[in-house]
């Protein structure tokens, strides 16, 4: 019965608001007004007049023009107060009939929470000292036909926050600040790389081969060409082609799509930055990564110390670096530096409670040890390098031990934030790696890499030694804004379809 009464109450509110809209029209006013030129945002009013006393403002009248959404409203008779909200925040307005006129005051009296209004008036301080605007002219700009969410606490239903982000932004200041920070973080990354001489480029999102990562793609069909295409799962292979072509320092910030599960860390479409630098290696990229992230934190937050949940994270340059085999040995006592067979590695996995598949080779098993035993312990920024060649089909082998590659992953607060390596530029080795991946796919690994003959042909023209990097932008923003879920940093995350 409660749900029925709530629906009836909502329907009553919708009806009342539409009746008010009709009244506005009948009085010759437009309930969905036109252009309105402001002189100030609410924050600009507060900053500009912060130092002026009540007496100073009364002596020297300061006119401003502001506009925003009514968030609170009180008063009776011939005067009333309201708080309106704009991009900068909220500010109080004071509306009197003898200042704005009877017709405009009636519009103010009939206005509902959520309506959008414009004010021309003078800045003053109330008896309690609150900086406010006394209206000399009141303009009705937009009638809200639906009531806002709960008045003081914003949206209480987390899923509704994600589905109707506009309501979340309307009522949740923290959410709005998160997305403003997101924009600033991406801009800071761009500025850093542009100043370092990197060229921003754009490459296709529709690929003929799903390559560049171990992931399941979204598949679509091009009608005119009658061919299957894949939404890109990585940006990598096209950027490497540009390195072959002579663009020596390139990056792209763009959407990537993976047809996989949804969690607090994963969304089917997400934003990545990938960059490549000719004549560099993974050590150079490691230094670039920590300098870039430390710079972005300082630029956007004003500090390199950030709070994430219960953890205080130090992003200042000087991050820990550890080989994957050493990390496994330190945590479990298992020494994968020693040569061993697949069967011996599987026996060690069973002994230590590490789940592996029959198709896993020694390199896969080393990685499973790391993911199941060590990853959850890495809170402070840590570069884990030296990944096995079996799980790194696009990375260059380490010249001192070809079982491993010159690759690293960055872990902060128990999750991967970046993946990088000295790029494999030997086309013969690359073909062999792709062939090994095809064998894995035939054995049941549906995330194994496809053969990409066009990319191999590009390598045959000669790619200089190159370092490459991929950073998950959304996870970085989660870290820098202390957001527990990836959905908190995506304006419109992917949600299960519901029938209304």
Curated annotation (Swiss-Prot):
<dbReference type="GO" id="GO:0006430">
    <property type="term" value="P:lysyl-tRNA aminoacylation"/>
</dbReference>
<dbReference type="Pfam" id="PF00152">
    <property type="entry name" value="tRNA-synt_2"/>
</dbReference>
<dbReference type="GO" id="GO:0016740">
    <property type="term" value="F:transferase activity"/>
</dbReference>
<dbReference type="Pfam" id="PF01336">
    <property type="entry name" value="tRNA_anti-codon"/>
</dbReference>
<dbReference type="GO" id="GO:0000049">
    <property type="term" value="F:tRNA binding"/>
</dbReference>
<dbReference type="GO" id="GO:0140096">
    <property type="term" value="F:catalytic activity, acting on a protein"/>
</dbReference>
<dbReference type="InterPro" id="IPR034762">
    <property type="entry name" value="Lys-tRNA-ligase_II_bac/euk"/>
</dbReference>
<dbReference type="InterPro" id="IPR012340">
    <property type="entry name" value="NA-bd_OB-fold"/>
</dbReference>
<feature type="binding site">
    <location>
        <position position="409"/>
    </location>
    <ligand>
        <name>Mg(2+) 1</name>
    </ligand>
</feature>
<dbReference type="InterPro" id="IPR006195">
    <property type="entry name" value="aa-tRNA-synth_II"/>
</dbReference>
<dbReference type="GO" id="GO:0005524">
    <property type="term" value="F:ATP binding"/>
</dbReference>
<protein>
    <recommendedName>
        <fullName>Lysine--tRNA ligase</fullName>
        <ecNumber>6.1.1.6</ecNumber>
    </recommendedName>
</protein>
<feature type="binding site">
    <location>
        <position position="416"/>
    </location>
    <ligand>
        <name>Mg(2+) 2</name>
    </ligand>
</feature>
<keyword id="KW-0479">Metal-binding</keyword>
<dbReference type="InterPro" id="IPR004364">
    <property type="entry name" value="Aa-tRNA-synt_II"/>
</dbReference>
<feature type="binding site">
    <location>
        <position position="416"/>
    </location>
    <ligand>
        <name>Mg(2+) 1</name>
    </ligand>
</feature>
<dbReference type="GO" id="GO:0005829">
    <property type="term" value="C:cytosol"/>
</dbReference>
<comment type="similarity">
    <text>Belongs to the class-II aminoacyl-tRNA synthetase family.</text>
</comment>
<dbReference type="InterPro" id="IPR018149">
    <property type="entry name" value="Lys-tRNA-synth_II_C"/>
</dbReference>
<dbReference type="InterPro" id="IPR045864">
    <property type="entry name" value="aa-tRNA-synth_II/BPL/LPL"/>
</dbReference>
<dbReference type="InterPro" id="IPR044136">
    <property type="entry name" value="Lys-tRNA-ligase_II_N"/>
</dbReference>
<keyword id="KW-0030">Aminoacyl-tRNA synthetase</keyword>
<dbReference type="InterPro" id="IPR002313">
    <property type="entry name" value="Lys-tRNA-ligase_II"/>
</dbReference>
<keyword id="KW-0648">Protein biosynthesis</keyword>
<dbReference type="GO" id="GO:0004824">
    <property type="term" value="F:lysine-tRNA ligase activity"/>
</dbReference>
<keyword id="KW-0067">ATP-binding</keyword>
<keyword id="KW-0547">Nucleotide-binding</keyword>
<dbReference type="InterPro" id="IPR004365">
    <property type="entry name" value="NA-bd_OB_tRNA"/>
</dbReference>
<keyword id="KW-0436">Ligase</keyword>
<comment type="subunit">
    <text>Homodimer.</text>
</comment>
<keyword id="KW-0963">Cytoplasm</keyword>
<dbReference type="GO" id="GO:0000287">
    <property type="term" value="F:magnesium ion binding"/>
</dbReference>
<keyword id="KW-0460">Magnesium</keyword>
């Amino acid at each position: 019965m409660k749900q029925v009464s709530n629906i009836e109450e909502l329907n009553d509110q919708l009806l009342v608001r539409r009746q008010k809209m009709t009244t506005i029209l009948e009085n010759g006013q437009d309930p969905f007004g036109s252009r309105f030129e402001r002189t100030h945002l609410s924050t600009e009013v507060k900053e500009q007049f912060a130092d002026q006393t009540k007496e100073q403002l009364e002596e020297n009248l300061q006119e401003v023009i502001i506009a925003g959404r009514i968030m609170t409203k009180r008063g009776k008779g011939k005067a009333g107060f309201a708080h309106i909200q704009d991009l900068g925040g909220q500010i109080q307005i004071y509306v009197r009939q003898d200042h704005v006129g009877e017709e405009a005051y009636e519009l103010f009296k009939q206005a509902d929470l959520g309506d959008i209004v414009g004010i021309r008036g003078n800045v003053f301080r109330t008896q309690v000292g609150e900086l406010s605007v006394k209206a000399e002219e009141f303009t009705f700009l937009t009638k809200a036909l639906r009531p806002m969410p709960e008045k003081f606490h914003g949206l209480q239903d987390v899923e509704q926050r994600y589905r109707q982000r506009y309501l979340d932004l309307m009522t949740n200041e923290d959410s709005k600040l998160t997305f403003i920070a997101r924009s600033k973080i991406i801009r800071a990354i761009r500025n850093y790389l542009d100043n370092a001489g990197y060229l921003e480029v754009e490459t296709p999102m529709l690929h003929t081969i799903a390559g560049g990562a171990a992931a399941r793609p979204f598949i679509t069909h091009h009608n005119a060409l009658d061919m299957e295409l894949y939404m890109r799962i990585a940006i990598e292979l096209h950027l490497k082609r540009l390195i072959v072509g002579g663009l020596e320092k390139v990056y792209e910030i763009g959407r990537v799509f993976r047809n996989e599960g949804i969690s607090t860390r994963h969304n089917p479409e997400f934003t990545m930055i990938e960059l490549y630098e000719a004549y560099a290696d993974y050590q150079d990229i490691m230094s670039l990564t920590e300098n870039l992230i430390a710079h972005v934190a300082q630029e956007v937050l004003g500090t390199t110390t950030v709070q994430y949940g219960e953890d205080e994270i130090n992003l200042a340059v000087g991050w820990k670096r550890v080989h994957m085999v050493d990390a496994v040995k330190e945590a479990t006592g298992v020494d994968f530096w020693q040569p061993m067979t697949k069967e011996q590695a599987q026996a060690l996995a069973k002994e230590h409670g590490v789940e592996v598949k029959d198709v896993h080779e020694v390199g896969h098993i080393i990685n499973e040890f790391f993911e199941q035993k060590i990853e959850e312990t890495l809170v402070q920024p840590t570069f884990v390098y030296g990944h096995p060649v079996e799980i790194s089909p696009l990375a260059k082998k380490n010249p001192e031990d070809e079982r491993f590659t010159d690759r690293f992953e960055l872990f902060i607060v128990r999750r991967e934030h970046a993946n990088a390596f000295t790029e494999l530029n030997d086309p013969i080795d690359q073909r062999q790696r792709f062939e090994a991946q095809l064998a894995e796919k035939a054995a049941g690994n549906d995330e194994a890499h496809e053969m990409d003959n066009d990319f191999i042909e590009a390598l045959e023209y000669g790619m200089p030694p190159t370092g490459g990097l991929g950073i998950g932008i959304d996870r970085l923003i989660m870290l820098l804004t202390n957001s527990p879920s990836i959905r908190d940093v995506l304006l419109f995350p992917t949600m299960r379809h519901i029938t209304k």
